[in-house]
UniProtKB/Swiss-Prot annotation:
It holds the Pfam family CSD. This is Cold shock protein CapB. Its main location: cytoplasm. Keywords: Activator, Cytoplasm, DNA-binding, Stress response, Transcription, Transcription regulation. Induction: In response to low temperature. One of its GO terms (molecular function) is DNA binding.
Length: 69
C-alpha cells in the first residue's frame, strides 16, 4: 500500500484532461482527470495544493487518487 504525498499543480489542461503535479520531493508526476477525486467537473488549477498516491504507469510515474487540500 502506497503512502499519500503532497504537491503543487504545475499545470492542467481542461480540454485535454491532463497535467502535471510537482511533488514536495522528486520529479513531476503526470495526472489524468480520471485520477481526480471530486464531484462534478474534474479539474485542477495551477498552484493548487493536492495530495495523491504516486504509482508507476505505462509511461512512467503518475498521480492517482488526487485530492485538493
Amino acid at each position: 500500500m502506497s503512502n499519500r504525498q503532497t504537491g503543487t499543480v504545475k499545470w492542467f489542461n481542461d480540454e485535454k484532461g491532463f497535467g502535471f503535479i510537482t511533488p514536495q520531493s522528486g520529479d513531476d508526476l503526470f495526472v489524468h482527470f480520471k485520477a481526480i477525486q471530486s464531484d462534478g467537473f474534474k479539474s485542477l488549477k495551477e498552484g493548487q495544493q493536492v495530495s495523491f498516491i504516486a504509482t508507476r504507469g505505462q509511461k512512467g510515474m503518475q498521480a492517482e487518487e488526487v485530492q485538493v487540500i
